[in-house]
Amino acid sequence: MTVEELKKRVVRQIDKNRDTIIGIAQDIMVHPELGYKEFRTSKVVKQAFQDLGLMNIRENLAITGVSGSISSDQKTPNICVIGELDALVCPGHPYADPVTGAAHACGHEGQIASMIGCAIGLTESGAMEFLSGTVTFLGAPAEEYVEIEYREKLRREGKIKFLGGKQELLANKFFHNIDMAMMVHMAALGPRTKVVLSGTSNGFIGKLVKYKGKESHAGGAPHLGVNALNAALLGLIGIHMQRETFRDEDNIRVHPIITKGGDLVNIVPSDVRIETYVRGKSVEAIIDANKKVNRALLAGADAIGAQVEITDLPGYLPRLMCEPLDKVFQKNAVSLVGSHAVAAGIHGAGSSDIGDLTYVMPAIHPSCGGARGIAHSEEFIVNDPETAYVLPSKLLALTVVDLLWDNAFVGNRIIEEYRPVFSKDEYLHVWQKILEG
């Protein structure tokens, strides 16, 4: 058996199970769930793992996460193939939940399908007989950093330490026996491009802001109140006035929403709440911009005579590149779709909690097409299931084969050459230092 013969066997099994892979994606698409609430989705993944006969199936990881593994007689290295369980809020999406407004407007149903598709290809082909190591398949919760107030409540109750699922799993030492990680995101790439390789991305600090004023009759005695909404608006205007100080090369993004603007229209608002991120290309840029944002928020309160509580929360670290691992993925992408359909990765102003993993292990986050429309909008729809769900299944599986072939020669070399920014044990203290500025 040569490595190319094994790859063909893996691809045949994925093609044979094409309808199953697409069916899993479509089922998850019409049953979207928000982060740390993905109970049904987690059960779907667990059932798929059981059907494939995966070992060491674990559930309730960071509340809703689920994992399973396959291995050879040689248990290391351990490669984690990740799919994200959660949706986001997009009430206008055609497949939105009518009650919660949750919708898969970022393609996470494709991640789960391709993670399971990878597992199908490797198990049904008997690939581990010819490979050396372990493959851990992970359905990870809560990548979308949303419902910040709800998650902060979970944190205060001691149910989580971090608002992002992979962060929580890292803090809970799930990743302590993992040597490298990879996943494939879905994207709207146009008709010619099928694959975009892994790139870098922004990180951010999450923020909860609460303005406190004084109630009074909004018509009869507004002068006796302290308008917290006015204070909040001045704070937001102050942030906008800071934008010319944000350097272009730092990719700063600040995008607040008011989650509560008061209680009743005829009462001077006394309780106004804001959620926002402060994003940037580097930790230093994020810290600098965050200080400016806090000054603006405080100034709004001072101007009106209100009070403001600012809670800075661990967001996500800027994503780093792992070129050796990305090149293995690239080779397989070119072999399946041709070099003309594979684009280089770029810097993205969005963020993901896999960024935190890139500081402690080799990890990649490439994308496959198959969708149209703008991500995080009601327009984001899968229009090519083959590219969205089946192609990434093959790419993940073939990359695993390359990494674990020949006594895991390639995988071990990447691990040995990788230099972590800090250790997994040090991770818990990293965000504390960042928030202290």
Language-model regions, residue ranges each:
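Histidine/acidic-residue-rich, glycine-tolerant segments that coordinate divalent metal ions
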Residues: H93-A103, E109-G110, S125-H255, G262-I267
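Acidic-glycine-rich active-site phosphate/pyrophosphate-binding loop
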Residues: V81-Y95, T200-K212, P366-A375
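Acidic/His- and Gly-rich active-site-bordering loop/insert found
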Residues: T2-A105, E109-T136, P141-A142
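Divalent metal-coordination and catalytic microenvironments
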Residues: I28, V81, H108, F137, ...
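Histidine-centered active-site/metal-ligand motif
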Residues: M29-H31, D86, H104, H108-Q111, ...
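Electropositive phosphate-/nucleotide-binding environments in soluble metabolic enzymes
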Residues: E4, K8-V11, D15-I22, F39, ...
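Metal-dependent amide/peptide-bond hydrolase catalytic core
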Residues: L233-G437
